[in-house]
Design a protein with these regions (language model features):
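Rossmann-like adenosine-cofactor binding region
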Residues: 90, 108-116, 220-293
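Glycine/serine-rich phosphate-binding loop and adjoining beta1-alpha1 elements at the start
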Residues: 25, 84-178, 307
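Rossmann-fold NAD(P)-binding glycine/threonine-rich loop
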Residues: 127-143, 267-295, 299-308
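Short, Lys/Arg-enriched N-terminal segments with co-localized hydrophobic residues
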Residues: 11-23
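Glycine-rich adenosine-cofactor-binding loop
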Residues: 30-40, 177-197
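Short acidic-hydrophobic, aromatic-tinged amphipathic segments that line or gate anion-handling sites
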Residues: 70-76, 224-228
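Residues in the short beta-alpha loop(s) of Rossmann-like NAD(P)-binding domains
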Residues: 36, 58-60, 129, 209-210, ...
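NAD(P)-binding Rossmann-fold cofactor-contacting core
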Residues: 51-66, 202-220
Length: 312
């Protein structure tokens, strides 16, 4: 007599078991190396994907408390197994050192480690730096500077502009309403800053060398000012906000500014301001980097996570 035994799997059970095995084989290992408060939300969002294993380096001062997350050291991280590497938005310095906010340990990307990454690996960073250009992009790995994407930069410009407003309130003794705000550059960040400061009642001057930008500024209802004419008008500025990644606020312009004026430089390193001369002149100049991570890390992290998950 044939007796059915539970040790035999049904067709549906076998199919389900095979599918689970395939999913296990398809899991991707993602390494997150350093980062600021934005990356906490990024990590949380990535863990919602059931096909990702997240390896964290540079977060030893935190207990993220997320499933599918493991804290490891750089020595424990096997590059040949990685599907993606997520670097800080600031990239790395010329020696390959990674910025870490949640660790006191030095993390360094070494060339021989990078060379072991599989060709299918995607390397995410915020900006391109010389080290990354030479050692990652040149290897023909999929290399994605996130801040080069218009959608990310536009969304990110909102907390940047709000951060500029916060710093303006903190570092001046006047209201934004009726203040003379000179905004240098009308790119993604500059455009949002113009809109926000204008909405608060500031007298906004939009400064650019680009004729299309000047026309757009005029249409937006602010005062367009060619960059070459900046020195003739900058004496009227209460607040100068720079978004141009080139030296535009030199000794010539700064010495014409009032001593109570404040410079907020939002451009990436090294900025567009002669900070040494501003200090000697007694003009407060602030290089305000990473404002989204300070002002709205949760929102900024969600923006990054959505973009990265779309590309994985």
């Amino acid at each position: 007599m044939y007796i059915h035994s539970s040790k035999y799997l049904s067709y549906d059970d076998m199919k389900s078991s095979i599918e689970r095995g395939e999913k296990m084989l398809q899991r991707k290992k993602i390494a997150v190396l350093g980062g600021d408060a934005r990356y906490l939300e990024l990590i949380k969002s990535l863990t919602s994907s059931d096909d990702l294993d997240i390896l964290l380096v540079g977060f030893d001062q935190l207990n993220p408390g997320f499933s599918a997350v493991k804290q490891v050291s750089m020595n424990e991280l096997e590059p040949t197994e990685l599907s993606a590497v997520i670097l800080p938005l600031s990239g790395v310095d010329e020696f390959g050192n990674v910025e870490t906010v949640f660790s006191n340990k030095q993390i360094t990307l070494k060339v021989d480690w990078i060379n072991k990454l599989p060709e299918t690996c995607t390397v995410f960073t915020g900006i391109t730096t010389p080290f990354l250009k030479e050692n990652v992009a040149a290897r023909n790995l999929k290399f994605i500077p996130l801040m080069n994407r218009n959608d990310i930069a536009i969304y990110n410009s909102i907390p940047t502009a709000e951060g500029a407003i916060m710093l303006t309130i903190k570092h001046t003794n006047i209201t934004i309403q009726h203040a003379n705000v000179f905004l240098l550059g009308l790119g993604r960040v500059g455009t949002t800053c113009v809109q926000k400061f204008k909405a608060l009642g500031a007298n906004v001057w939009s400064v650019s060398k680009n004729k299309e930008d000047l026309a757009r500024a005029d249409v937006m209802g602010v005062t367009p000012l060619p960059l070459e004419q900046l020195s003739a008008h900058i004496h009227a500025a209460d607040i100068v906000i720079n978004t141009i990644p080139a030296k535009v606020l030199t000794k010539k312009e700064i010495q014409l500014m009032g001593s109570q004026a404040v410079i907020l430089d939002l451009a990436s390193k090294p900025g567009g301001t002669d900070f040494s001369f501003a200090k000697a002149r007694g003009v407060e100049a602030i290089h305000a980097l990473g404002l989204p991570g300070i002002v709205a890390p949760k929102t900024s992290g969600e923006i990054l996570a959505n973009a990265i998950k779309e590309m994985l």
